[in-house]
Every structure is written in C-alpha cells, then in structure tokens.
Design a protein with these regions (language model features):
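Auxiliary, metal-adjacent structural segments of Zn-dependent hydrolase domains
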Residues: 38-151
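A short mid-domain helix/strand-loop element embedded in enzyme catalytic domains
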Residues: 138-158, 195-211
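Short pre-active-site segment immediately N-terminal to the catalytic Zn-binding motif
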Residues: 154-171
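Catalytic Zn2+-binding segment of zinc metalloproteases
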Residues: 175-192
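Acidic/histidine-rich catalytic neighborhood
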Residues: 190-231
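Short alpha-helical functional segments enriched in proximate histidine and acidic residues
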Residues: 45, 179, 183, 234
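Pan-zinc metallopeptidase signature
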Residues: 228-335
C-alpha cells in the first residue's frame, strides 16, 4: 500500500508554487508578530458578531504561522490521517485519466508527488485555514489548529496596498469563525469525516469522479457551503470601528477572486477551487436570507443537531430550511 509522505508533498508543492515574496528578516518577523497579535484579537470579535455561545473557545485553538511548503505538508498529513492513506492514494491513482491505473500499486513517492502537485495552486493562494482534522492540542477545547500562511498574506497585502494588521485580523476572523462552528457543533467533525470517507470510497471504483450533488458528496457540499458562507457573513459584519479598511479589503478580495488568468481558472476547475468560490457565494446567500428571516439566533439553531444541517436543495431555498428546522412562527420577526 502506498503511503502519503507529507514532507515530499510539501517539497513538490513548494517547487511548483514558485518564488515567495521576499522580505528582510526584521520585516518578516514583524509580519509574523502582527499576524499572531490579530489571531489573539479575533475570538472576541467572532463571539460578538456570531452570538455563538462557544465562540470564545476558539481562543484555545493553537496558531501556526507557516510558509507554503509547511502548509502543504500539514494538509497532506491531515488528509492522510482522516481518509486513510489507502483510500487517498487509491483515489489519486484512479483520478488521473488512466495515467496511474496502469500501475497495480502506485509507489508512495508517486502518490505523494501527485498530491503535492494537486495542492500547489492552493498553497500559493490560501491565506489562512482552520484545520479541524489536525490532532487536538494539549489544553485546546476545540479540535484542530489555525494555520496562517505568512508569504501569501504578505503578497496579497503588497499587491493591493492593504493595511497589514486589518488584513491579518480579517483573515483570522474568517478562520476562527470556523473554529467557533466546530466548538458550537461537536458533531461537525465526525459528520464531515464520515461522509468524506464514504464519498472517496465510492469514487475509487470504475467511475473515479466525486459526486458532489447527491449522497455523501451532496451532504458535504451543503455543509461546506454553510461553513464558508457563515464565515464570510461574520467577517463582512465586523464593525468598521474595529476594521477601518474593511471596504478596501472587500474590494481587494473580490478583485483577487474575479481577476484570475484563464490558465489559473482552468487549474481552479481542475483542483476544485472553483467549487470553493461557489460555496462562498451560495453559503453566504443562504446565511443572509436565514438571518433576514429569523435573526442570528435562529440561524444558530443550525449548530444544535446534525439533523439541522441543510440539504443541498435547502442551500438554494433557505426558507425551506427555516420551515423545516425552526417553523413558521419565527418568520417575519425582527432580527
């Protein structure tokens, strides 16, 4: 059985992402210190905006400020631990258009190279990531860890001449909203893992494509849309007084997402990143419509029980979810 080598995955990904932004040691240290300071501020903001009882627990999540290679290695390690090397390597082997099918047993090195190549585009783009699949740290009351990719934050800040501390805070609010979600809904981690394993297992047969509109894949698409949309909602609701350059940040982020070159858009479709962009939009619309109908407190009933998780159909019809989970008595109330 082939095993995923996170170190090799990181090295391959790093090579393919190209040069990182250069900074003198003093500036680099200041960037890292600023990112860490904003990670400490973010939990209070998440708690105030989201009104989630467990949001303050996100302050216990360990924070790692990493480079691209370290991010890719850590992501590969988490995926391998949760999905299992056997399932992950089998899917990688079968999803390459027949290239690896000719091999009865792809080597660990070959599978690791494939995974590294697959993570390369994301390694160059990701600003931060709450990783709920990482092992629990000592003393943490929430699973996982917060990862912030310093070179990418610096590159984005320079490209759009953004306030560095505001950008770091904005990213941290988004990612620690995810930590708050998992703290508020302890069932979330197993819900996602069980369906991810089932989806990948189903895709290792004759048809290696991942079904994302029905079955376990549909469940994952729906819950990921909610998680991403809710994090977008919270980060965009941070008061201007706490995030003075918020309008500039939102414009820069929108431009960054919209102005990808044709080859990059093709790669995004190939790696599934275009789906993540769609999740932001669909999920934020769902969250906004639910909040408009029943307020933030009504939305927060979503986290109470896995049966409250919306279906893929309900993502497109938020009031259908409101009727099913909350009932019609709440409709039209002040939010």
């Amino acid at each position: 059985m082939a095993h995923i080598d996170p170190t090799l995955v990181g090295k391959v990904s790093s090579i393919l992402t190209g040069r990182i932004p250069q900074a003198p040691p003093q500036e680099a240290r200041a960037v890292v210190a600023g990112i860490r300071a904003m990670a400490r501020r973010a939990p209070d903001i998440v708690a105030a905006v989201s009104k989630m009882d467990a949001a303050q627990l996100s302050a216990t999540v360990p924070v790692y400020v990493l480079d691209r290679e370290q991010w890719a290695a850590g992501t590969a390690s988490s995926l391998g631990a949760v999905l299992g090397d056997e399932l992950l390597s089998a899917h990688v082997g079968e999803s390459q258009g027949g290239r690896l099918k000719a091999l009865t047993a792809p080597s660990s090195a070959l599978v690791s190279v494939e995974v590294g190549a697959g993570l390369a585009l994301m390694a160059k783009s990701v600003l931060g990531q709450y990783d709920p699949l990482a092992p629990n740290a000592d003393g943490a009351q929430v699973p996982g860890r917060l990862v912030l990719v310093a070179p990418n934050i610096l590159e984005f800040q320079r490209a759009f001449d953004l306030d560095q501390r505001d950008l770091a805070l904005w990213v941290c609010v988004h990612e620690l909203t995810h930590a708050a979600q998992f703290a508020q809904a302890p069932w979330l981690r197993d819900y996602i893992i069980s369906r991810a394993r089932a989806m990948v297992k189903d895709a290792t047969g004759s048809d290696a494509s991942l079904a994302l509109d029905s079955g376990p894949g549909g469940d994952i698409s729906a819950i990921m849309s909610v998680l991403e949309g809710h994090a977008e909602f919270v980060m965009n609701a941070v008061p201007i007084g706490q995030l003075p350059s918020k309008r500039r940040l939102k414009t820069a982020m929108r431009t960054r997402r919209d102005n990808s070159s044709p080859w990059k858009k093709w790669l995004q479709r190939l790696t599934g990143m275009d789906m993540k962009m769609g999740q932001y939009a669909a999920g934020e619309t769902f969250v906004s419509e639910v909040v408009k109908a029943v307020g933030v407190e009504g939305l927060n009933q979503l986290w109470d029980d896995p049966l409250n998780a919306p279906s893929i159909e309900e993502i497109a019809s938020p009031l259908t979810w409101v009727h099913r989970v909350i009932g019609t008595d709440y409709l039209g109330r002040d939010s």
